[in-house]
Design a protein with these regions (language model features):
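Alpha-helical oligomerization segments
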Residues: 163-223
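N-terminal domain-start signal
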Residues: 16-61
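Domain-length accessory/inserted modules outside core catalytic folds
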Residues: 100-111, 139-140, 178-181, 194
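Surface-exposed peri-terminal alpha-helical interaction modules
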Residues: 3, 9-21, 146-147, 201-205, ...
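Intrinsically disordered, low-complexity regulatory segments enriched in Ser/Thr/Pro
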Residues: 44-72, 159-184
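Conserved binding-pocket/active-site segment within a compact domain
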Residues: 120-179
Length: 223
């Protein structure tokens, strides 16, 4: 189920891209009928139909509302050049040429909701990350690497607050992310990922009982 819809030009671009190029992207498969694709994002699966201009979650929570930003992110992934293998080099957004200029002010990494939700609850953050298929890392007080797409990991490093410093979260990326996405989509990727991380833990949130990771896939493709 969608909310606000992507602009028609996003769909036009996707319809114009050769189908074999789209299907070469990790985590993307063809559905047996029509021209739709199945795309994995974290532990969920989505139908993306460029002919009907429709995106739906098929598993585990088909009734999940999908933001405009999320829908654009999926389409832009399907339009992205193949960024190749992971380099294994972790970098911050400001390590990219021009990153220090772009990723500030309104484009600072949108991680504040994670800080508010988990700044004093590191183990709850770990538990939530594991629900989404994340891997624990040995950085900060706790850190988790999420795989929104198979070859585009995002690592959240959480430092719990103390008497001297407030809690904080930073993001790290494999250097190859810049071969997949421009800066605006790296920002959108973190925005969407942050929303998904805090989603289940939001006060008063209503979650579908099927939203338990039943669609979790092994998407750790490194070639």
């Amino acid at each position: 189920m969608g909310c606000a819809q992507p602009h028609p030009f996003h769909w036009e671009d996707l319809r114009a891209r050769p189908r074999e190029e789209v299907l070469s992207l990790p985590g993307v498969t063809a559905l047996p009928e029509g021209a739709a694709y199945q795309v994995g994002f974290l532990n969920a699966l989505y139908l993306v139909d460029p002919q009907e201009e429709r995106i739906e979650e098929t598993s585990p929570w088909p009734r999940r509302p999908l933001s405009k930003e999320f829908q654009i992110l999926l389409i832009r992934y399907l339009l992205a050049p193949h960024g190749g293998k992971l380099t294994g080099e972790l970098v911050s957004e400001k390590d990219f040429p021009g990153g220090s200029t772009f990723f500030q002010g309104p484009h600072a990494m949108p991680v504040d909701p994670v800080v508010r939700r988990y700044g004093a609850a590191a183990q709850a953050f770990v538990a939530r990350g594991l629900e989404l298929g994340a891997e624990q890392m040995a950085l900060g007080d706790v850190s988790l690497t999420f795989y929104p797409f198979p070859l585009i990991p995002v690592t959240y490093v959480l430092w719990e607050g103390d008497e001297e410093f407030p809690p904080s979260v930073t993001c790290l990326f494999d250097r190859s992310v810049s071969k997949w996405f421009e800066f605006d989509m790296i920002f959108t990727l973190v925005l969407v990922l942050t929303e998904r991380i805090v989603e289940a833990g939001a006060a008063g949130a209503t979650t579908d009982p099927r939203h338990t990771g039943g669609a979790k896939q092994s998407q750790r493709e490194h070639s």
